[in-house]
Each structure stands twice: as C-alpha cells, then as structure tokens.
Amino acid sequence: MSSVMMCCCLLLLFGLLSEGREILVGGKSNTWKAPESRDETLNQWSGRTRFKIGDSLLWKYNAENDSVLQVRQTDYERCDRSEPIRGYKDGHTNIELKRSGPFYFISGEEGHCQRGEKLRVVVLSPNHNRSVVDAPAPVNIVLSPNYNRSVAAAPLNAHIMNKGSLNTAWSLLLLLPLGLLV
C-alpha cells in the first residue's frame, strides 16, 4: 500500500512540476476566423502572451468552413497555402510547441489569410525567462579598526529567487502531508 501511495505522490509531483500549458488560441473559442477589425488580431493577442517550450496551442473552430495550416515564414507572409508543413481540419486542433523560435499558422480556406486569419507565435528559449541580474559595481569600503572580519555579509542579490525554485518549493510543501501518510 505504501509503495502505491509513493507512486501516486511521485506522479502528482511530476504533474505539478511540468511546465507545459494548454493555451486556447485567442483566449476563447471561435477566434480562428478573419478578424472583424484590425484593432484586435490574433497576432496582437500572441504578442501579449508568453509561450514556452512544452506549451500547446488549442484551436476551436468550425471544421466545416475552416482549417489550420502550419507554414514557413515566407508562406505566412504571402498567405501561400500550397505547401504547408502540416494541415489540420478537425475543429479542435492541438499543437505542442516543442522548440523555441517562431511558428507560423494560416487559414487553409481561400481568402481567409488575406483577410487577416493568420497567427505568428514566438516561443521563448529556456534561458529567456530567467532573471538576469548584472553584477553590482565595485564599492570601496573603508573598514573601521573595530571591524570583526569573521562575520560574513549576505550576498547582494540574496533577495532574488528563481521563479522555478519557488514553484518547486510550493509543490513540495503541498506534497509533504501526502508523504507523511505513507
């Protein structure tokens, strides 16, 4: 029984620590269509959204009159549907973003891309979301004669914590009661 509980805890921990998210394209259903105005396009939405390796894009659309094509940058710019990397027409398309860099998607229906039904997504590299802190400028310190050299000062950037470490700490804290049951 305790080994089963331990396996369950490990699976739960793995699930909590995984970073991939499922992101609904446009933030809601039926956004995969030619925009009604140039004020709010899918590219404006994607520019406000941070995408990481392991995230999945989910399109919900009417499969009877639309589709999703993953294309190269030049095909995206020209709205060229002739040689897609991949094509989807299921109405519930889910694509995992497995690498950093740009991804390009256009509608597979005649004239839709030309009317703005297209999406460019940029996936951040794994190192991009880490905080970069420059080293502080050197400071000349004059020590008083009574200064105790055995006391160590805290590092200048001690208040900075990697966000991933914080998530890991909370996940472990949540799992601690389960571990006590084993």
Curated annotation (Swiss-Prot):
The lineage of its organism: Eukaryota, Viridiplantae, Streptophyta, Embryophyta, Tracheophyta. Keywords: Cell membrane, Disulfide bond, Glycoprotein, GPI-anchor, Lipoprotein, Membrane, Signal. Glycans are attached at residues 65, 129, 148. Residues 158-182 form a propeptide. Disulfide bonds join 79-113. It is a lipid-anchor; GPI-anchor. GO terms for molecular function: electron transfer activity. This is Early nodulin-like protein 10.
